[in-house]
Amino acid sequence: MNPHAKLISLISLLLGTTITISSNHWIMAWTGLEINTLAIIPLISKSHHPRAVEASVKYFLVQAAASALVLFSSMSNAWATGQWDITQLTHPTASMLLTAAIAIKLGLVPFHFWFPEVLQGTSLTTALLLSTLMKLPPMAILLMTSPSLNPTVLTSMALASAALGGWMGLNQTQTRKILAFSSIAHLGWMTMIIIYNPKLTLLTFYLYILMTATVFLSLNTTKTLKLSTLMTSWTKAPVLNAALMLTLLSLAGLPPLTGFMPKWLILQELTKQEMTTVATIIALLSLLGLFFYLRLAYYATITLPPNSANHMKQWYISNPTNTSIAILSSLSAILLPISPMILAAL
C-alpha cells in the first residue's frame, strides 16, 4: 500500500475517533463514525487478496447499516423531543434503535456475525485496529447514552456475548478468529456493567486494549496466523512466546495477572447491585474463554506437533529487541498490585 495513502487513512482514523468522542451533537458523532468507516476500508483491503476484498465489502455494508440506524434513532429522538444532544436520548424507540446500532458497531451478540469474518480476511495489524481503536467511538457513545438505555436488553446481550464468545472460540484454529471471539466475550463483560458503573467499563476497556494490542503485536512479530504455526514459534522467539503466554493468561483473567482486576471489580459491582445470579452466570461463562486461552498458552510454549523426519524446524534467529512489546507485555502481567491506585484515580 502507498505510504501516503496509509498515512492519510491513519490520520482520518484518529480524526474520526476524536470527533465522535468529543461531540455532544448526534450529527457530529455520526460524521466521526462515517470518517472512521471510510478510513479503515483501504487498510482492510490493502493486500488485494479476494478474502481481504470480501472482508472490506462485508465491513462496509454492516457499518453502513449501523450508521443509518444511528442517524434514524437520533432523528426519531429529535422529532419526539426536539433534542439533538447525545445525553438527551429519552424516547424509548430511539433508545432501542441506538442499542441495536451500537451493538452492530461493536459486534455484540446477536449482531456479531461480521466481526470474525472481517478479522480473518485482513492482516494482523489491521485486525488490531479493528479490535481496539475502532471500538472506541461506539463505546464512547454507549457510555454517554447509558443512563437512557434499557438495562434488561443490555444485560441479555452481554450474557449472550460472553457465552457465545467463549463457546465459538473453543473449536477455532485461526488465531485471528480466536481473538475475534475473545473480543466479543470481553465486550459482553463491559456492556454488563456500563449502566451501573461507567468508569469501571472504561477501565476494563483500557486494559482490554492493552492486553489485546500485546497479543496482536506478538503474533505479528512471529507471523503466527494458525495454531500449528504457534506451536513451532518457540524456536524463533522463546522470550516473546513466554511473554505471550503470560498475556494470554492475563486476558483469561487469571490472578495474579492484570486481567484479573476488571473481572474481579465487575463481579464485585454486580454483587453490590444485588445481581448475584447474573454475576455467577457470567463468572461461569468466563471458564469457556479460560479453556481456549489456556490452549493457546499451551501451544505458545515448547509444544511441537507430530512431524515427519524431513520437517524443517524454524530455528532460533536472533532478532532485535522490540521495546514496545516488552513494555506492553510487562503492563499486561503486573498491574494487579497497583489496582488500589488505579481505583483511586477513577
UniProtKB/Swiss-Prot annotation:
The keyword Transport applies. One of its GO terms (biological process) is mitochondrial electron transport, NADH to ubiquinone. It is found in: Mitochondrion inner membrane. Disulfide bonds: none annotated. Its EC number is 7.1.1.2. InterPro entries: Complex_I_Subunit_2, NADH_DH_su2_C, NADH_UbQ_OxRdtase_chain2, ND/Mrp_TM. One of its GO terms (molecular function) is NADH dehydrogenase (ubiquinone) activity. The keyword Isomerase does not apply. Its main location: mitochondrion. It catalyses: a ubiquinone + NADH + 5 H(+)(in) = a ubiquinol + NAD(+) + 4 H(+)(out). The chain crosses the membrane at residues 1-21, 25-45, 60-80, 96-116, 124-144, 149-169, 178-198, 200-220, 242-262, 274-294, 325-345. It comes from the Eukaryota. It is an enzyme of class 7 (translocase). GO terms for cellular component: mitochondrial inner membrane. It is a multi-pass membrane protein. Keywords: Electron transport, Membrane, Mitochondrion, Mitochondrion inner membrane, NAD, Respiratory chain, Translocase, Transmembrane, Transmembrane helix, Transport, Ubiquinone. Pfam families: NADH_dehy_S2_C, Proton_antipo_M. Belongs to the complex I subunit 2 family. Core subunit of the mitochondrial membrane respiratory chain NADH dehydrogenase (Complex I) that is believed to belong to the minimal assembly required for catalysis. Complex I functions in the transfer of electrons from NADH to the respiratory chain. The immediate electron acceptor for the enzyme is believed to be ubiquinone. PANTHER family: NADH-UBIQUINONE OXIDOREDUCTASE CHAIN 2. This is NADH-ubiquinone oxidoreductase chain 2.
